[in-house]
């Protein structure tokens, strides 16, 4: 018997320690597997710590086994991320997963996943309609789900958990999902006494502020970030034709022309704001930037271990 946690640990923090302790207490007979992203994340960010460091700290705090989520899944939209992660869970004959959930209503997530599975033709029609209107894929997906179910999934962890359960239901995997209550405040900039969201902690790290109250990890500047690689990104986009940029994975729908149009923005934040639109979310843009920076035409053939950035050195716990 085994249970899986699907994670990025960017960075690993006290909330993750609590999740591991909760899982060990409530599933004492199960080995805990972490399906862990590597050096790049689903939002298109460079991980603050590399895969080896994240693996070591997870093992220190209670995980039994670490399985790497391949780059081709780890740096994709939520539905592809979930597809890859749950596929790995099934391949390793792990019969349970547990994830944080704001609603903590796993039965409702199963209900919605079954509705989706039974109404895929209608769902896909609504999805295509919303995409034609210029919605981003996440918003189009939310629109389609609401049309077939009358419900909205609002919170980010519920959305990702729903994607996990969709994969379980669609593939009839012998996996049972469980949830761990995650408070809404956990995600805000008003952290609990010793727990804060990874988003907030990344902000503190980037501002060179201590996160010792919230995490056992320590970071030394400069830390890894797309902002620090923006000059290199500018150079590549300027020197590469739109035709050749379009050969890179995720560069489609004319986003290469949009990048060229705004490539003279003076910094990463202004570039992101200029390119962001109803169709292109920040995460979609950042994922495309990663693929351009490392010239990735086929993510299934990309060996991220060959990318060794100085900013990963001396980051640890």
UniProtKB/Swiss-Prot annotation:
Subcellular location: Cytoplasm
Binding site for ATP: 6-19, 100, 157, 182
GO cellular component terms attached to this protein's record: cytoplasm
GO molecular function annotation: ATP binding; ligase activity, forming carbon-nitrogen bonds; tRNA binding
Predominant localisation class: cytoplasm
Alphabetical keyword list: ATP-binding, Cytoplasm, Ligase, Nucleotide-binding, RNA-binding, tRNA processing, tRNA-binding
InterPro entries associated with the record: Rossmann-like_a/b/a_fold, tRNA(Met)_cyd_acetate_ligase
Protein family: Belongs to the TmcAL family.
Name this polypeptide is given: tRNA(Met) cytidine acetate ligase
Species of the source: Mesomycoplasma hyopneumoniae (strain 232) (Mycoplasma hyopneumoniae)
Gene: tmcAL
């Amino acid at each position: 018997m085994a249970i899986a946690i699907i994670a990025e640990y960017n960075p690993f923090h006290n909330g993750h320690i609590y999740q591991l302790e909760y899982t060990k207490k409530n599933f004492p007979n199960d080995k805990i597997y972490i399906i862990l992203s590597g050096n790049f994340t689903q939002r298109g960010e460079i991980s603050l710590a590399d895969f080896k460091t994240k693996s070591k700290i997870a093992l220190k705090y209670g995980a039994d086994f670490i399985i790497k989520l391949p780059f081709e899944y780890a740096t994709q939209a939520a539905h592809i991320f979930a597809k890859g992660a749950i596929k790995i869970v099934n391949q390793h004959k792990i019969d349970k997963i547990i994830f944080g959930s704001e609603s903590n209503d796993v039965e409702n997530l199963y209900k919605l996943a079954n509705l989706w599975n039974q109404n895929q033709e209608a769902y896909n029609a609504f999805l295509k309609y919303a995409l034609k209107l210029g919605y981003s894929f996440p918003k189009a997906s939310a629109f389609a789900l609401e049309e077939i179910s009358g419900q909205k999934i609002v919170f980010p962890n519920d959305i990702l958990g729903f994607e996990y359960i969709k994969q379980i239901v669609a593939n009839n995997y012998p996996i049972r999902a469980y949830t761990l209550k995650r408070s809404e405040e956990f995600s805000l900039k008003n952290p609990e006494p010793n727990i804060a969201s990874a988003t907030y902690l990344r902000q503190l790290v980037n501002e060179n502020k201590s996160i010792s109250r919230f995490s056992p990890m320590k970071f030394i500047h400069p830390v890894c970030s797309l902002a620090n690689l923006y000059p290199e990104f500018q150079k590549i986009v300027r020197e590469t034709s739109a035709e050749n940029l379009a050969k890179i994975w995720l560069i489609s729908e004319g986003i290469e022309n949009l990048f060229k149009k705004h490539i003279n923005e003076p910094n990463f934040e202004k570039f992101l704001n200029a390119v962001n639109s109803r169709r292109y979310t920040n995460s979609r843009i950042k994922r495309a930037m990663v693929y351009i920076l490392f010239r990735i035409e086929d993510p299934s053939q990309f060996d991220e271990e060959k990318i060794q950035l100085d900013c990963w050195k001396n980051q640890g716990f």
